Amino acid sequence: MMELEADRMANLKLDAKEFSPELKVVMEERRMRTEDNPHALVYERLNSVAFQAHPYRRPVIGWMNDLDNMTVADTQNWYHSWYAPNNATLVVVGDVDHETLFHLAEKYYGGIKSHTLPQRRPLVEPEQLGIKRLSVKAPAKLPYLAMAWKVPKLKDIDKDRDPYALQMLAAVLDGHEASRLAKNLVRGQKIAQSAGAGYDAALRGESLFILDGQPAEGHTIGELEAALRGEIRRIQESGVTAEELARVKTQTIAGQIYKRDSMMGQAMEI
């Protein structure tokens, strides 16, 4: 496996005859996962509105127009620009002997030359001067709401406080069946059919804190938005209970431990 991956890093040849059918597969994947999926479509457009200068505004798979106009040369140029050992990390997990592993890595990757990578420019967003709103028209049985706030990412694991607080906030709102959104909006007021919160601290650029959900039958997007904002306001005014905080801390620690149960989980964590 290591020999094959090393060869692919150094000697990949892209063939025009193979490229065209593979590109069609990617285009169909985009249609299935995004264009025919109202929730995914909402989040794609949310990112395009939330971010003005950062590459996060563009979907990873690209817009359909990008795929329509992509050539073998585009792909080959990208490969030559970024596929290099000085831009790669080799992760191996499992029952391996580290001395043997280092020997194999040196054998197969050691001869691949490094090269100068394209310059990475600062990824700084211009100041946002007001609320941005977007309506997405797509076939769906129920309307769907997503709200996002630009928030700090984790830069210094020892000094940063806000990212950890945001993780706890997301868990208090949507970490378990007894969390506030499920308890108050879904089962309590019955305003929402579903409601959630999310935050990712480990990003290169700015992160987003997200609240989302679907209104219950007979309720509107406006009512759901007001209810979600109301839950945030209650925490701002009254905080969270000691019991809530203890529970989500325990859940967060347990989640980190459970990642070690699978090889893939360990590899992705590294």
Give each language-model segment a name.
Residues 166-176, 228-235:
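Bilobed periplasmic-binding protein/Venus flytrap-like ligand-binding cleft at the lobe interface
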Residues 11-14, 31-38, 52-57, 111-118, ...:
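Secretory-pathway/luminal and periplasmic proteins that interact with or process carbohydrate-rich
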Residues 76-80, 132-136, 195-201:
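Short beta-strand/turn micro-motifs at beta-sheet edges
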Residues 1-40, 54-55, 66-87, 97-100, ...:
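Active-site-adjacent, His/Asp/Glu-enriched structural segments that form or flank metal-binding
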Residues 158-173, 182-183:
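Active/ligand-binding-proximal structured segments within catalytic/core domains
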Residues 52, 60, 89-155, 259-260:
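An aromatic/glycine/proline-enriched structural segment found at the starts
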Residues 1-9, 38-65, 87-93, 143-156, ...:
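M16 family metallopeptidases and their MPP-like homologs
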